[in-house]
Structures are given as structure tokens and as C-alpha cells.
Amino acid sequence: MELYKVNSLVELFFEKYKEKKEFKNHVFLKWLKTNDKDFLTWEQVKYNICLLSVYLEENLSKGDRCVLLSENRPEWLIADLAIMNAGGVTVPLFTTYSEKDYEYIFKDCEPKICIISNEIQFKKVEKFISNKTKVISIENFNQKIESIETILEKNSKKETHKIFDSYNDKILRKDLACIIYTSGTTGNPKGVMLSHGGILSNCEGAMEILELLVKNDHPVFLTWLPLSHSYEHTVQFVQILLGAKVYYAESLEKLLPNMAIAKPTIMTAVPRFYQNLFTKISQNFSKQKGIKKRMIQSTIYLGIK
């Protein structure tokens, strides 16, 4: 794909889908917290994006902010692309923000729509949600709040077959894709405004390296860094470019057993990952005795040398 010709992140997904038609029945997204058989194919993801987009378009004007508060899961990517396809701007929130941060962000961005994963996340921000803001949930937990599942079911019954062959082609590279707020450790969180073109440029830079490293036609990612972080948020579009299979880890604590299940061929990492890995290895090392322990010590010594 010639990225310089792509105008938006939405176009990126749909053009990749068209480019590799055989993808449609390939496994694309899988959350390791759910049943082993629960996965989404490229076709299902595309279908859900289109259905959710139709609903969001009825409630959004171009540039309206949409808060997305959720742990990493397949619905995160679906909601993100659906928001942008409907002309909105995604405002991803960390699930670990302080109450003060949540209050500030909601006042600052004035979201038109708030997509929340479950009751736990909803309770964190409930009192900061304006009466003018429409709340949508990923999981069913409140009869007064419409869920994505209900929305998809309703729209699937409508005569909307035409939308599945097209996307919003009015989005330009200069248009705002998302606003990612800093953690607020040095005062109030600062909203970083990222355009479609800016993120696409980062993807282009990443591909210059990854295309040389990823020899496999179907690379496997294990995503564990928060998608609300600008780094991992960009990576999800690199995953699309590579036509990868994506597993979402349960948590940092379960990262190693999740790696054994997903068998990733590529992962994004930060110092915290290596620290966690080193700690686990050190704990196992301390339990070893005799010749096995001496062999490990020799290996470490040679590695350092």
C-alpha cells in the first residue's frame, strides 16, 4: 500500500481490507480474557465498524469529541475507527486517571458521546458526564445505557448494505483524529491533538523498519500497553498495515502466560516490560540449585561479557 496516497486512518483500514480480500475470514482480533473461541475476523470487524458508524453519524457533527474509556479489547479498535468514520474525534482515556484528571478532561473536551466498557469504568466518571453527553457501553450493565451490542443488532436489521462497500472519504490528512491527554503529573492533563496525517506518517516510518524484520505474511501481535497511550494507539494502525493477528493481553501480571498462548512474533515494549520479565526470570533463577544454577550463572556471565 502506498501510504502517501492514504488520507485517513479510516481509509487505511478499508483499503487494507480491499487489498487483501482473502483476509475477510482470517482471525484479526482476540481478547485473551474471553473464551478461546471468541475472536473476530477482518470481515466481522469491518461489519461492526460500519454498523456503529451509522449510529454515531446520527448523533455527531464533524469534529465532535467522543470519549473512549476502556481496557484493551477488540471493541476499542472498532469504536475508535467508527468514531472517526462518523466524523468525530476520539478522546482516549486511561483507566488509571485520578478523579481530578477525569473531571478536568470532561470539562475541557466537552464530549458529545462517551463510550465506556463496563460499570467499573462508568462509576469513575459518572458524575462528570453532562446531560448533553450520550453514553454508550461495551458491556450490558445498565438498562438506561444503550450498549454497542444493542446498537449493532438494531442497525443490522436496517437496509444499510450500501455502507459496507464505502467509508467516509471526506476526511483529510490535516483533520484531527484524536486528542490524547497527558497523565497530569505536572499539573492539569494537556490534550495532545494528533491528525490523521501525523499518525499515518508515524506508521510510514515504522513500516520502513518492520517490513525488513517481519518476514511472516501473517505476523502475530500481543498488545498490552494501554491503547489510550499515543505509542500503542499508533501501533494498532501499524498492525492493520501488516495484516496482523492481534491478541489483547489480560493484564501486565498475566503477560507471560498470555505470551505462551498468543505466541507473538512481534511486540511493542517499554522499560517496564523488560523489568517485569527480568523479575520473573530472577525469581525462577533463585529457586534453582546445583549444576542448573551454575549453568545459568555462566550463561549470564557470558552474556554480560
Q: Where do the language-model regions lie?
A:
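Structural core segment of the AMP-binding/adenylate-forming
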Residues: 58, 85-154
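ANL superfamily adenylate-forming
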Residues: 122-173, 282-305
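Conserved pre-ATP/AMP-binding loop-to-beta segment of ANL
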Residues: 158-181, 188, 214-220
